Structures are given as C-alpha cells and as structure tokens.
Amino acid sequence: MSIPTTQKAVIFETNGGPLLYKDIPVPKPKPNELLINVKYSGVCHTDLHAWKGDWPLDTKLPLVGGHEGAGVVVALGENVTGWEIGDYAGIKWINGSCLQCEYCVTAHESNCPDADLSGYTHDGSFQQYATADAIQAARIPKGTDLALIAPILCAGITVYKALKTAQLQAGQWVAVSGAAGGLGSLAIQYAKAMGYRVVGIDGGADKGEFAKSLGAEVFVDFLSSKDVVADVLKATNGGAHGVINVSVSERAMQQSVDYVRPTGTVVLVGLPAGAKVSASVFSSVVRTIQIKGSYVGNRADSAEAIDFFTRGLIKCPIKIVGLSELASVYELMEQGKILGRYVVDTSK
C-alpha cells in the first residue's frame, strides 16, 4: 500500500495560537504501533481545552489535536500482532498505557501515570495519518460507517462507562445534564438501550425537542425553569437515581448534588476549567449519596460501547465538515451552539 510522505493536518504551535491547516510529515509507526489512515474524526470539548491549554496538564507542542479518529490500518510496527493491513481501527483518547502498573493490571488504563493521550501528549486524529498503540487501538468491524462511529471512540465510550459507574437498574431514572451536546446525545441513547428512564437537562426549546427525539422521557429547560432542582425532583418522583454530568457548567454540576435521589450516584464527566463541586457532609451522609468521577473507559468498555453502535442501538447525530474548517467548529463549541457532534472529513 502506497503511503505518502506528507499529509494535510491541523496543527498549532502554541496554546491558543493559530490553528494551521497545512502539510506536515506522515508519522512512522513505532514497533508497537499502527499507522492509521484517518478518514473521519469527531470533535470534542477536550480538543478545545488542549488547544487553549487551560487544563492543569501540559500538552505537547506543537500539537495535532483529535482523539476520535476512525480509519484504516495502512502500516504495522514490527512487533505488532493481531492486526492486518486494511483493518478498520479507531484512535481513542488513551493512545497507549504501560500495561504494568497497578491501574493497568486492574483495567483502569485511563489512570495509568504513563498514559499517552491522543491529541494531547501524542499527535492525534486531526490529520490524515496517525499512529496508535496496537493494544489500545479500537477494533472497528469492517463495513462500519467510519463517519458515524467516530464520536463513539470518545464520547460514546465515555458516557457508556459513566452510566456503568452510576450502577443503575433497569427502570430507574437517570438525569443527563448537557443532554443535547455530543456526549449528552449519546448518553440518552445508551441509557435507553440499557433500560433506564431519562431526564434531559439543557437550555433551549430546540435542544428539548432534540433530546426527546433521542429518547429523553422528560426535558428540563434551564433557561425557562424557575427551579431546575424542583423540576427534576417532581419529574422523577423524588430525584434521579443517577446523574451523568456531561455539561461544562459548574452550576449545573452543583445542582445535580441536590436533585439526585437518596442512595443515588452523581457522576462527574465534563471538565470545565477550574470548576469545583461542594456537598454538605451531613446531607451526603444522611441521604447516602455518592459523587464519583468517570474518566473515559478501558478496552472492554470500548468494545462494549462499539458493540451497542454496531447492533444499531445508537445513532450518532453528526454534522460533517472538512478538516480545514476545524477553527469554525471550535467557535461554535465555545458559543454552545452545537447539537450532537461535529465530525471532520480529513480529505477536505
């Protein structure tokens, strides 16, 4: 298979600096890596944070962002087994991990202190050819629509793992805060597929219609609601058994502590820069609530999330634009104007 020496990519040299759509060299895979011809990549809020550099974790610079890349394997490192040229593969947030530390050996690879992060510490999927550790790369069944599955590789895996973290039972209520965004739109669908009842929370009538079209039974509009907490408590007859916070609003996260049901679980997923959540010790103990963080997922979570998609249970509401338009997608993201998920076509 012919592999070019240069490719189109979006790269930035300083945090917050110009997003340059330009030719850069095609990377060569290390002995343990795949070289993947990325066809499509989802665009995530994490990519925005990586560009801005506003998280307490340094990025590599210069950097090619992106960590929801779906494509075709075009080259194998000399030590790679179990993959073939032409296989479909996905680039996830966890590009690689040590596989030897206490976290890796207990299936918590995302907590590995030496984890290599796509589009953050490792050049990611906003390029036509990208490398990924062969063990961590996601296996995608051949024939899959690569544009539609791209958001599953981070957003889907992340919300699926968060729902597992909430430890709910079929028929129980789960509130999805940030319901109309890229993660929220998938969280609603995974929750329905897992047998849960969904309260979607977001701002705007259009977002309410969108959330309900995906399966939300109830929608609470924080723009028109006089009391979000009271509305959720009423809709769920006592509070949500679980809350999936994919919103990037600190206030929304704080409210979730108050509308979660006694014995329920608040799951924190979204990562607004500098945000904090406080909880009354007395109330937390007496109501027996749990507040947990959930950070992407392991290899098993990834395979399970992809399986839900390939069985037709999850529909990714996407809009496809060219990779060259990435800067405008970031602008829309900052303005909170995105329904579902934007996906970039690396050929444009």
Curated annotation (Swiss-Prot):
The keyword Chloroplast does not apply. It is an enzyme of class 1 (oxidoreductase). NAD(+) binds at residues 178-184, 202, 207, 269-271, 341. Its cofactor is Zn(2+). GO terms for cellular component: cytoplasm. Keywords: Cytoplasm, Metal-binding, NAD, Oxidoreductase, Zinc. InterPro entries: ADH-like_C, ADH-like_N, ADH_Zn_CS, GroES-like_sf, NAD(P)-bd_dom_sf, PKS_ER. It is found in: Cytoplasm. Zn(2+) 1 binds at residues 44, 67, 154. Converts ethanol to acetaldehyde. Homotetramer. PANTHER family: ALCOHOL DEHYDROGENASE 1-RELATED. This is Alcohol dehydrogenase 2. It comes from Scheffersomyces stipitis (strain ATCC 58785 / CBS 6054 / NBRC 10063 / NRRL Y-11545) (Yeast).
